[in-house]
Amino acid sequence: MPHLPLASFRPPLWGLRPSWGLSRPQALCTQPEPHGSPVSRRNREAKQKRLREKQAALEAGLAEKSKIPAVPTKAWSHKEVVLYEIPTGPGEKKDVSGPLPPAYSPQYVEAAWYQWWVREGFFKPEYQARLPQATGETFSMCIPPPNVTGSLHIGHALTVAIQDALVRWHRMRGDRVLWIPGSDHAGIATQAMVEKQLWKEQRVRRHELSREDFLRAVWQWKHEKGGEIYEQLCALGASLDWDRECFTMDAGSSAAVTEAFVRLYNSGLLYRNRQLVNWSCTLRSAISDIEVESRPLPGRTVLQLPGCPTPVSFGLLASVAFPVDGEPDTEIVVGTTRPETLPGDVAVAVHPDDPRYTHLHGRQLRHPLTGQLLPLITDTTVQPHVGTGAVKVTPAHSPIDAEIGTRHGLTPLSVIAEDGTMTSLCGDWLQGLHRFVAREKIMCTLREQGLFRGLQEHPMVLPICSRSGDVVEYLLKSQWFVRCQEMGDLAAKAVESGALELWPSFHQKSWQHWFAHIGDWCVSRQLWWGHQIPAYRVIGENAEDDRKECWVVGRSEAEARAVAAKRTGRPEAELTLERDPDVLDTWFSSALFPFSALGWPRETPDLAHFYPLTLLETGSDLLMFWVGRMVMLGTQLTGQLPFSKVLLHSMVRDRQGRKMSKSLGNVLDPRDIISGQELQVLQAKLRDGNLDPGELAVAAAAQKKDFPYGIPECGTDALRFALCSHGILGGDLHLSVSEVLNYRHFCNKLWNALRFVLRALGDNFVPQPAEEVTPSSPMDAWILSRLAFAASECERGFLSRELSLVTHTLYHFWLHNLCDVYLEAVKPVLSSVPRPPGPPQVLFSCADVGLRLLAPLMPFLAEELWQRLPPRPGGPLAPSICVAPYPSTRSLEFWRQPELERCFSRVQEVVQALRALRATYQLTKARPQVLLQCSDPGEQGLVQPFLEPLGILSHCGAVGFLSPGAAAPSGWALTPLGDTMKIYMELQGLVDPQSQLPRLTARRQKLQKQLDDLLNRTMSEGLAERQQRISSLHLELSKLDQAASYLQQLMDEAPSAREL
């Protein structure tokens, strides 16, 4: 080994022997190290590949290293499942006296903790008020009540992950937190499910039972099946106050619904009228806008619909002639996608300025089916450049036509009945036929009469009932409506004035537009399951006309009777009242949830302390249907906004960018990700669903492609962390299982890190308070500074509700700062004799603070590991990590050393460069010496304190300095680092040029071929990615040429060395 000319070796920082003499302890990971014991060729090649990948990362810049990978860095292999088998009663604290299992296992980690948290009352605001770190501030929030019928899908899991992270952070920082759990009775969905069950088990239809018997069956089903969703919430770690759980059909909620209806009616904001409503013929009920799925059709599309005997074609435009009365050779051709509504036509409309029809203004047309006279009317809403410029007017079955009919005084004709068949107004030849069967019969008749003018493909949007799959009809029905204009104006002004904050702010535009065009809200539903409308019809009062019926509203029949007596002037005893059999829209009770869940209309302590809510967090798809209605009714009924801040997260989509939907078969069940699931079971779930054969085949193929070996067990913590790691406040969220799996690997990394820390601390370790922990080396100071910085960034992320900043910060600290750097650097220090006292205290601080930072996002893993840390003198900070103080910026600011971090960033660049050199020359075992030549004395001063850890982290031997201007040592490889530093690494005696040169040549030929292929491609093929890859190949080729030059130099010098 040649002498190092003008080299100055830095003595070891911790009083140890030089790093080239150290025996390296076993690494934390389970794979053998490249410089350890002999390894197989396969393992060695795998290690070299990883080193090359790290070299590429260096070339892309160190900033890339801090990014959280979007895909796993390790292939999945089945892991051994470890179970927690120590007998522990429900609610008892988990036994953590034994050693940690060798590897992370989600089932072991997640066992027993949740029941203990609940029993101890950690989730109750009364407990939090007694915490030492109590701030006296209140944080209240409610969960968007999921439908009691179903199970949580991945969209629900996203909501829970976000809300629970925020709730746990507020609780740990000392706020008095109330997170209200609840579930929605889901009128249509629940009734449909129970009807299916009754038919399947008893062959009984709903109408064969009395209303009381059917509701009894629904409640029985709810008690038996409805708890599944609560079990899922617990499995996700949702820290809800279960003592305050509410159901939208329980006694308290029912009283609130009745009170709200009565107050709105008495205020003139609720009325009954005959208007067009969204109607599901299969359900025989009005449905809400959110239950109408707008399905775009590019052209002719064949659908099989419930209740229809044959498939139906949509996306076709039929042209029909309307003869002009008195002019046998003159006709107006009208295009329609709904020929079945022709019997309901009462006019044809054209634009008043359309020159094609000016001469026909005021004329009469003959109905093509009945021959009746119809007026030709003019209306400015008609678009003259669309089709023929003439439209048929069917006020009873089209919202647009209803407006035209109202303006022109046209009488609507209802030709489609509640069950989707044709009414008696159509004549005997159509009455009772399914509307889509009648469609074909009508077109055949038009052909026979010579009035059919053709059929062509036509793109359209088809309204589909999301509950039944049937086409939505617009029917005229007598229903109850809420006047929304006045309340909507107040909701719009609340956002405009800043009293109500929507985040992200770009939702404000949609909010203002929706409320500027809001119509009245139909709240009647023709169901049995739900809140029966507290309205009563007075029998005998104008009963011959439903538009003039006498209706009264009351909290009870007695109250309604008193109102009826006053209105009619008749004695109460003489009145006969009949209660409206309809129920209220589920969204009506949901809109009351923020205050009904707290006891409204009663003046309860919870209502006084926690209302208005601090924050409303939900999916952006519910902004209008739920959030908007909560704001309207909350302001109207309580005199206050129900919340002042709304946080709207993105929609979850699959890897192809499609919305996750049961109708597409691409929904991810959180339980499958948490516990793992075999492909056969996943495919069976698809077959058991309601997909048609074509959709089933597509969904099954996609599922098999995405999960050829099923879904691996990832655990709750990994799923929560993955969901929160996305920028949830912007565009759609594209989640893949591979991302979640990557975070399971991250959990395993944390697990192994804490096993190392616990071994390093030993049995007699006594932690010092954070303010007394003094770094004994630059590395100690650096990791503590990074820890304080992580705490500051996490606090900033939680305050701004940007959870992706929190996850990014924690991932980077634990993986890249603590595990990859500090633990590797400190291992030789911990094995030294005598062992300095500083590093163990630093390790404890990193584990304690790091786990508390992590706890809101990974509550199970954080609790499991934190409970095993050595106890502090005088007892632990808290009985559970979920009520321990959350580290704040102020509490750790004494550790911050930004200048030191900047210095070490340069050291890390040197480490990366050295690792890249080792990979190039395949120095898997040897520890070459290193010389650094700095042209700037200041830079040498930055690096000098870290020479010892630099050698350890780069797996090199002694590290020293070469004086500026000194000649390069012979037999050493050179790589520049910017313009101010040259790095020399010893090659003489460590590399065999004769074996390495052919390898480099082969590698160069392979890369050159890749480069030639890229250069020969057309410029249009992924230009940006192509240019980036070309630049990377040029750089790698240049480095290979340089390496080959050094190896050739070694070969040339070999003979003279032998002669000596």
From Swiss-Prot:
In this chain, the stretch annotated as Disordered covers 25-50
| MF (Gene Ontology) | aminoacyl-tRNA deacylase activity; ATP binding; valine-tRNA ligase activity
List where the motif 'HIGH' region lies. 146-156
- Transit sequence range: 1-15
> Single GO cellular component annotation?
mitochondrion
Q: Which family does it belong to?
A: Belongs to the class-I aminoacyl-tRNA synthetase family.
Entry keyword annotation includes Glycoprotein: no
Database matches in Pfam families: Anticodon_1, tRNA-synt_1
Q: Which cysteines are joined by disulfide bonds?
A: none
Residues with the N6-acetyllysine modification: 548
Record-level GO BP terms: valyl-tRNA aminoacylation
The catalytic activity of this protein is classed by the Enzyme Commission as 6.1.1.9
Respond yes or no to whether keyword Transit peptide is given for this record.
Answer: yes
Q: Tell me where it resides.
A: Mitochondrion
Locate the motif 'KMSKS' region: 659-663
Query: Catalyzes what?
Result: tRNA(Val) + L-valine + ATP = L-valyl-tRNA(Val) + AMP + diphosphate
The UniProt entry, under CDD domains, shows:
Anticodon_Ia_Val (cd07962), ValRS_core (cd00817)
Which amino acid positions bind ATP, per UniProt?
662
Q: What class of enzyme is it?
A: ligase
Matching Gene3D superfamilies: HUPs, Isoleucyl-tRNA Synthetase, Domain 1, Valyl/Leucyl/Isoleucyl-tRNA synthetase, editing domain
Q: What is this protein called?
A: Valine--tRNA ligase, mitochondrial
What keywords are annotated for this sequence in UniProt? Acetylation, Aminoacyl-tRNA synthetase, ATP-binding, Ligase, Mitochondrion, Nucleotide-binding, Protein biosynthesis, Transit peptide
Species, as recorded: Mus musculus (Mouse)
Role noted for this protein: Catalyzes the attachment of valine to tRNA(Val) in a two-step reaction: valine is first activated by ATP to form Val-AMP and then transferred to the acceptor end of tRNA(Val).
